């Protein structure tokens, strides 16, 4: 079995008043038999959250193109990860949101994925070992669809072995923000 160390970066969230001077991250050690739902729980605890909400993991290729969504078990329907876009919508999105220096190959992959999205995955049924770290460009995680606490996840290390229990935080940087802003301070 493989043990993975993932670095989980928390993106700024200006609508909730979270704009830190320094980057906030947690390094989490997890073995390949753990599910994405268990990885979610580890991230949830690492960032000192207390009110449970829906979440989503998205795999991305080396160009940052979303490949597939893995969702909270109660949201899982096994349908497409997102709704299909028609050619006009895809062209408009590429023109407005895709970087000018994106390769034609990346744009074509985006076009194919958006016109025929893959089925979403169930986070409770998908293990870490199901991902190939050599081909996984990036993984993103959004907690609380609505307040949109967005995270970028990158693989730091792998080693042979297994954990005897739950995933663990092995390093951290920066203070975790409050899950909800204090309205009296705004």
Name every feature range the model reports, one short phrase each.
Residues 1-186:
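Short linear regulatory motifs enriched in tryptophan with gly/pro/ser
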């Amino acid at each position: 079995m493989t043990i993975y160390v993932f670095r989980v970066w928390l993106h700024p969230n200006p609508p909730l008043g979270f704009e830190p001077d320094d980057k906030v991250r947690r390094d989490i050690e997890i073995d390949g038999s753990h599910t994405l739902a268990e990885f979610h729980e580890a991230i949830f605890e690492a960032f000192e959250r207390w009110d449970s909400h829906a979440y989503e993991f998205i795999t991305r290729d080396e160009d940052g193109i979303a490949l597939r969504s893995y969702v909270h078990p109660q949201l899982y329907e096994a349908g497409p990860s997102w709704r299909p876009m028609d050619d006009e919508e895809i062209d408009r999105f590429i023109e407005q949101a895709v970087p000018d220096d994106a390769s034609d190959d990346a744009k074509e992959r985006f076009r194919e994925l958006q016109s025929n999205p893959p089925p979403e995955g169930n986070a409770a049924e998908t293990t870490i070992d199901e991902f190939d770290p050599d081909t996984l460009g990036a993984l993103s995680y959004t907690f609380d669809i609505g307040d949109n606490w967005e995270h970028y996840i990158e693989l730091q290390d792998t080693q042979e072995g297994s954990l005897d229990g739950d995933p663990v935080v092995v390093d951290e940087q920066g203070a975790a923000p409050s899950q909800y802003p204090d309205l009296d301070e705004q």
